[in-house]
């Protein structure tokens, strides 16, 4: 296919599609206990659906006139896609910003070198423990710890310093300090501590009481931001809602921007547009088939997208509706809120639990 060089021709007043999130595969080569997507386990003998290259190109072609400037390649596991290198070639050809989220098992020196050819790139690697016993237990496959560490080394060797993502739970919370040191030693650009979402497998993890309590999450978040981050040799981020973040760090813009929900759209492996990867779990949040539904029509006219643009943040309910940070936070994660409560305006579970426990910062609530 020839280069997709259309200029931004979106109608006046229509929001820009900044980034397409491509969920390239329905399968994954790990079986992570906390995954919010819940992809099917894939082996050499069991293959699952992947997004066709032609639909990848179609989505980009139709998004370019609407302002597209970047893509995120995620999954499932994006490196399982049989034509991953071809997808990278398309990204380079169209001069798009590239983000890749991977577990690292297939991030070989060759793949790392291909990623490095994309000039505007970022990569994140999941590492959920500082030892094989912890990481492999969480990820469900022996050897995944060593593979993930090697993936970081491969990327660094080819000029890409990845972000390491560490998902917090009872099994690994005592390794937070050691994880900072490991990230520094491996040459990562940053380390992000993720809160496990109660979606798909993550919901089961919460039900099994393997997730951290809200009080513990708040305590760890405060420790990471106030103690670890100032002295670390890599950038440190803790993924909690704006109401719990340090105002100085928010003002710095250093990784603490608002949710990009107004400028992103998902493309799932079945070849459908969706709010994001939540479309894999919630059919209500699928917006039409790529190549059949015109993207400009979807972006402009879809009832859910229109409701979000018109209703956020004013229609947020509960503690989120009262929060002084709602303009920045936008409900933290609308997809998670809809999954939990069946409404776009539901309060974010983290903030709701904190408020119910008397732990929500009073200074961040409207009087």
Locate predicted features.
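Short beta->alpha junction loops/turns
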Residues: 25, 77, 104-105, 128, ...
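Flexible loop residues that form catalytic
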Residues: 40, 76, 128, 196, ...
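Radical SAM enzyme [4Fe-4S]-AdoMet core and its adjacent flexible, acidic
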Residues: 94, 117, 126-128, 133-293
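Accessory C-terminal segments flanking Radical SAM cores
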Residues: 240-360
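Residue-level signal for the nucleotide or nucleotide-sugar donor/cofactor binding architecture
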Residues: 51, 82, 143, 171-174, ...
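Short Fe-S-cluster ligation motifs
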Residues: 58-75, 308, 346-367
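Conserved alpha-helical substructure of the radical SAM core
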Residues: 2-122
